[in-house]
Design a protein with these regions (language model features):
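Aromatic (phenylalanine/tyrosine) cluster motif
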Residues: 6, 12-15, 21, 27
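Histidine/acidic-rich helix-loop-helix segments that form or flank divalent-metal centers
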Residues: 129, 138, 178-236
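Short, positively charged and aromatic/hydrophobic N-terminal segments
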Residues: 21-22, 26, 33-34, 40
């Protein structure tokens, strides 16, 4: 690991202006990452303007049991997810998603719905054998599965067919920097295979229990007849979300 002062000098010599600010804020909170990793993982969004966007998933992130994984997901939403993710609808054609997932912010609302359906499925006895760690991998995969829906930077429709693989690769690279360890195969594979039978590469279709769980949550949340009033709220209205999100549809009296 680099010493903080040494790292600061080298970052300053290689980057300037806005890029220096974004790199320092996004990747050096503890000044512990190498220059090579910083170059590989330059933020894909406007970091200064989006540092707190993970707040829109506060309730869903709390489903994750591991504090470290919660921190990772917040970091990923704040610093890695491209800007377009926060504004586009979940379906470019408007044919295959419910009304709540259409229009501005639709992809965010869809992602929240996938996380909720995942949590509902995890309450069922057939998933009881999964360890807490593996359940958390499923939760993280649901939250991050569409974060590269049209690429890592600018909106590019041509990248849609492989967006699962692109997202999985970016999550893996970010994981290795964030945790300084290998990325769990089950996590990246669940992201890569979330489209199920529509996954471009047949080798990447759901195989493991977590793969199938994540695909099932995404599939159900994508059905046109689904309507969840709590998620229909404008996600920019944080006060409104705070008021309605705790009333999750599966909570018992």
């Amino acid at each position: 690991l680099w010493r903080p002062a040494f790292l600061s000098i080298h970052i300053f010599n290689n980057f300037s202006g806005e890029n220096l600010y974004k790199l320092t804020i996004a990747f050096c909170p503890e000044m512990r990452y190498t220059i090579n990793n910083l170059r590989e993982l330059e933020p894909t969004n406007s970091t200064e303007a989006s540092m707190n966007k993970s707040q829109f998933f506060d309730h869903e992130i709390e489903f994750i049991q591991s504090e470290d994984l919660r921190s990772f997901v917040r970091y990923y939403f704040d610093c890695i997810v491209p800007d377009y993710f926060w504004t586009i609808g979940a379906s470019s054609s408007g044919k295959f998603h419910p009304a709540m997932s259409q229009g501005e912010g639709g992809l965010v609302r869809h992602t929240k719905a996938v996380a909720w359906f995942c949590e509902e499925l995890l309450r069922m006895s057939q998933w009881a054998y999964l360890t807490d760690e593996r359940k958390d991998y499923a939760r993280v995969a649901c939250l991050l599965h569409d974060t590269a829906k049209y690429g890592l930077h600018e909106f590019d429709k041509e990248l849609y067919p492989k967006h699962g693989a692109i997202a999985a690769d970016q999550v893996c690279r970010t994981w290795m920097v964030f945790f300084e360890s290998d990325c769990p195969y089950e996590l990246t594979q669940a992201i890569k295979s979330h489209m199920g039978q529509w996954t471009t590469d047949k080798a990447d279709r759901p195989f493991t229990p977590i793969d199938r769980l994540v695909h099932m949550a995404d599939y159900v949340a994508s059905r046109a007849f689904i309507d969840i009033p709590a998620i229909n709220a404008d996600y920019n209205d944080k006060a409104e979300l705070d008021e309605i999100s705790p009333e999750l549809p599966w909570e018992e009296e």
